[in-house]
């Protein structure tokens, strides 16, 4: 039986999904399963690693049954995952010693404060490209070792293993034969030197993490190990591709050349720009990260995150009840020619890159007696585009690369008004692909390259199909006037603390 399909596993923050992708890069089947969010204290977020594993087994079985495809036809498996979420488990039994601590969780704030106090900020920045923040995996591992009796001792003896979600899933799928991660996930731990491409002794000492518990770091596309037959109806299937979700989306968008960038409009926004084989150190509050390792070399990216994007549209719907469903926002915004000087700064949880101001809160400016809900809705949508320009401007400043086009995906990329305004306020075209499942496609493409479903990146590029290209329609002076108004609004919001 010909092996012509790739199984892509997308292990996300609220659900796990499995998709089967054919040689043309088309998704031919999907299965999805949600799992519980655990909130032990305010600001803490955890998952049961065993429940995540059970959800992965369920979606694999579900998608194979739904599509009537035999596991004998699967050429390889690609994995993409919520980044930074951390698991520590017993090497012998395979049981986690504590819940997985999720990327959103703030429970390691005290550890981060101590690192700052001890003056580690520059060291971490210069070796990892990251900031000291509870977001990243290293402090989560330290927290678990501190809070589970005997864990530090057992880790030093080599009895415990550490991993991000990709590592945990590969370990389980292969029956413990492979304890690995890829470059993209390793670069989110605070423990990995992204320049020397190795676990860094100084960083390990800083957080007192025993080297014995760390996974081997491998390229993002190669055959790592085969699954154990009992997970796949009697088949051994190669696990052949891994990338963290945002890097996978960059790959799935075909952003293979230096200077290509994508924006994922989800609850927040994640912008990544490929900077090629050279790491760019940011002077503007962006993260430097590994994009992927492929063909014997690594490529780097600049990353900026916007905290509030799609959630601002949900706020219009659920908080203010201005729209019945999120998609109505496009209709309201398109009814008027402009937002008439109204600016919404959606800093509900502070502002991310490039401001990094956690104390600022949301604000609205420019209201008059004539302001109606159309202006308010339009201004809210426009705020997503302004924030995107802020980040992309910082990327251009850091990299010295001028953006030619922006590729987009995620829920809010379906909003035609927003995409047109995004193009106008950036002054570059915006391209939306037909297949918006770019994260899953990225994982599938990485696996498919390793097992020979696709020959090279040039062949993959052909499977990226354009849905719509939004060309710039706004005049330069109008663009700069609007953008200047946005900056005034942000400054005013920051003054009100």
From Swiss-Prot:
Record-listed E.C. numbers: 2.7.1.30
Q: Which GO terms describe its biological process?
A: glycerol catabolic process; glycerol metabolic process; glycerol-3-phosphate metabolic process
UniProt catalytic activity: glycerol + ATP = sn-glycerol 3-phosphate + ADP + H(+)
Gene Ontology molecular function: ATP binding; glycerol kinase activity
- Identify the keywords attached in UniProt to this record, alphabetized: ATP-binding, Glycerol metabolism, Kinase, Nucleotide-binding, Phosphoprotein, Transferase
Binding residue positions for ATP: 13-15, 267, 310, 314, 411
Would you indicate the residue range of the signal peptide? none
User: What role does this protein play?
Assistant: Key enzyme in the regulation of glycerol uptake and metabolism. Catalyzes the phosphorylation of glycerol to yield sn-glycerol 3-phosphate.
Similarity comment: family membership:
Belongs to the FGGY kinase family.
Activity modulation notes:
Activated by phosphorylation and inhibited by fructose 1,6-bisphosphate (FBP).
InterPro entries listed in its UniProt record: ATPase_NBD (IPR043129), Carb_kinase_FGGY (IPR000577), Carb_kinase_FGGY_CS (IPR018483), FGGY_C (IPR018485), FGGY_N (IPR018484), Glycerol_kin (IPR005999)
Annotated metabolic or biological route of this protein? Polyol metabolism; glycerol degradation via glycerol kinase pathway; sn-glycerol 3-phosphate from glycerol: step 1/1
Question: Where, per the database record, does this protein carry Phosphohistidine?
Answer: 231
Q: Its GO CC terms?
A: cytosol
The answer to keyword rRNA processing applying to this record is: no
Task: Tell me how the protein is altered or processed after translation.
Answer: The phosphoenolpyruvate-dependent sugar phosphotransferase system (PTS), including enzyme I, and histidine-containing protein (HPr) are required for the phosphorylation, which leads to the activation of the enzyme.
CDD domains given in the database record: FGGY_EcGK_like (cd07786)
What residues bind sn-glycerol 3-phosphate, as annotated? Answer: 13, 83-84, 135, 245
The record describes its quaternary structure and partners as: Homotetramer and homodimer (in equilibrium).
Which Pfam families does this entry report, sorted A to Z? FGGY_C, FGGY_N
The UniProt record gives the binding positions of ADP as 13, 17, 267, 310, 411, 415
By what name is this protein known? Glycerol kinase
Binding positions for glycerol? 83-84, 135, 245-246
